[in-house]
Amino acid sequence: MNPSVQQKLENLSHRFEEITGLLATPEVQNDQNRFKALSREYAQLEPCVACFRRYRETLEGLDHAQALLQDPDPEVRSLAREELETGRKRCDALEQELQILLLPRDPNDERNVFLEVRAGTGGAEAAIFAGDLQRMYSRYAERQGWRAEIVSESEGEHGGYKEVVMRISGQNVYSRLKFEAGTHRVQRVPTTEAQGRIHTSACTVAILPEFDDVEIDINPADLRIDTFRASGAGGQHVNRTDSAIRITHIPTGTVVECQDERSQHKNRARAMSLLQARILAAAQEKQNSEIAASRKLQVGSGDRSERIRTYNFPQGRLTDHRINLTIYRLDAIMEGDLDPVIDPLLQEHQADMLASLAGS
């Protein structure tokens, strides 16, 4: 292992021990902000420190096996050679794992997200597919132990959604979903197609990280806040109260709605959070076009040609065009089994980062 890398791992291990001690002190436990910050740092360091511990234990095992090669018993020497071969392979694997764990982290990886799906090219069929995508992501959230809730929705005339916004909360949500942003293309025979012809439609997906304390100054005078009656499920209650909220940020023309909660106060708070996320994403895009959270770079125009992924229902095939990944298990994927798609994307991203670091 490179000495500088080893020194960095030693420093991280010392910091981990320091944080472990601090978290046990009454001073930190009584300071919720500091306790939360240290707990977050602890969770970030733990996988790397645990892997480094296994690496050092494996090295100690190799030293022990190397010493046994001098044993007069030939059977012991044979076992030592086997142990050396196994240990060296394990060391190589752990060193590779440590390199990945040391890669710079996206500061948004641990954040909750607002996931937006919009029907693009394809009319009614695009709206139906938007509904299918919303359901797919909801099912995936369930599998991950996350919570998914619809913030706002505009239903399609024949089902699905013209637009739907979900808030997904849980552990490391953004890290798993950030590569879902872009144009998703579907090829299938619509239920309204009498001739049995395959149609091509498209939807756009945007992934916006949610910020707890957004450092962005929004002047209340720049906001127009409207209330209206919520539509959709909810029984008679939604017809009696103007609980839904629409907020317009006048300088940027950004409009957000929230009608998920029965409480107008909760809807307003959720809408403000979404507004902040959108404005910040737009500001980041303006400052740095390479930021992955940039919403306009994520979604494109919704044209079929700007695709990151194709869902071909007649063939039961999903193709991710960014990494030339093809999987023939579309039914399972649409039911939320997205790990076989997301994991290769993460691995490719890590490989690109490793190559970039090696090149520099």
Curated annotation (Swiss-Prot):
Its main location: cytoplasm. GO terms for molecular function: translation release factor activity, codon specific. Keywords: Cytoplasm, Methylation, Protein biosynthesis. SMART domains: PCRF. It is found in: Cytoplasm. One of its GO terms (cellular component) is cytoplasm. Gene3D superfamilies: 3.30.160.20, 3.30.70.1660, 6.10.140.1950. The modification N5-methylglutamine is found at residue 236. InterPro entries: PCRF (IPR005139), Pep_chain_release_fac_I (IPR000352), Pep_chain_release_fac_I_sf (IPR045853), Prokaryotic/Mito_RF (IPR050057), RF-1 (IPR004373). Methylated by PrmC. Methylation increases the termination efficiency of RF1. It comes from the Bacteria. Peptide chain release factor 1 directs the termination of translation in response to the peptide chain termination codons UAG and UAA. Belongs to the prokaryotic/mitochondrial release factor family. This is Peptide chain release factor 1. It comes from Methylococcus capsulatus (strain ATCC 33009 / NCIMB 11132 / Bath).
